[in-house]
């Protein structure tokens, strides 16, 4: 009887958990992760979504602990634990992909305002610390031993007009995408409106990334 009572008392809490950990947010996180993984450049950090997911994870952890203490059916608890693990994995993967891009295009992001603004505050701190650490390391081990004309971490020499040592994402990379709605040439970048004139809803399209940057940023397209 005690076990049955414990099971019944846990049901409202599990119902609250189910309400809060909405499928919509999990699917949105999947979409954000796929977009980030497929895009050659860093995308806008999904701050509101990440905050909601963190709150849902915290509640899920509490529910699992309470359910175990109340001797709720182990199978039920394991299902909730699996759902929790899946959400945590997605969130970690989302962070990991973004950090990899920040490390790869570190200097380019920091010198490009609109890209820097796409980072979270924590990511901006990480990027600046990486820049300082990398700059100090290269200066101590290599650059300080080179002639003055070749001591820049950004340029091959002082005669270079641009930062030719800074890698940039290749926006001419081809990606697979799917439109959430019908798109006409007005939905794409004006410079490329002749390259891509329309896109049907839910139709997979293999296209140059820079052609679909605008609708992607507006949430009209998802990458695959």
PLM regions and their residue ranges:
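Charge/polar-rich, low-complexity and marginally structured segments
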Residues: 2-184
């Amino acid at each position: 009887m005690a076990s049955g009572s414990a099971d019944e008392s846990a049901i409202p809490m599990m119902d609250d958990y189910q309400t809060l950990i909405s499928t919509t947010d999990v699917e949105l996180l999947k979409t954000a992760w796929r977009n980030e993984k497929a895009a050659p450049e860093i995308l806008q950090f999904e701050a509101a979504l990440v905050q909601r997911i963190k709150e849902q994870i915290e509640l899920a952890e509490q529910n699992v602990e309470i359910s175990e203490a109340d001797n709720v059916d182990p199978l039920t608890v394991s299902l909730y634990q699996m759902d929790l693990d899946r959400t945590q994995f997605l969130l970690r993967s989302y962070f990991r992909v973004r950090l990899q891009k920040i490390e790869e295009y570190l200097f380019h992001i920091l010198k490009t305002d609109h890209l820097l603004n796409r980072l979270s505050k924590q990511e901006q701190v990480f990027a600046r610390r990486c820049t300082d650490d990398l700059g100090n390391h290269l200066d101590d081990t290599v650059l300080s031993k080179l002639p003055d004309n070749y001591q820049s971490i950004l340029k091959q020499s002082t005669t270079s007009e641009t930062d030719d040592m800074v890698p940039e994402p290749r926006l001419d990379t081809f990606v697979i995408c799917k439109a959430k709605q019908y798109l006409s040439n007005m939905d794409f970048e004006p410079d490329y409106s002749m390259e891509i004139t329309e896109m049907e809803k839910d139709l997979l399209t293999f296209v140059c990334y820079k052609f679909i940057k605008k609708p992607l940023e507006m949430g009209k397209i998802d990458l695959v």
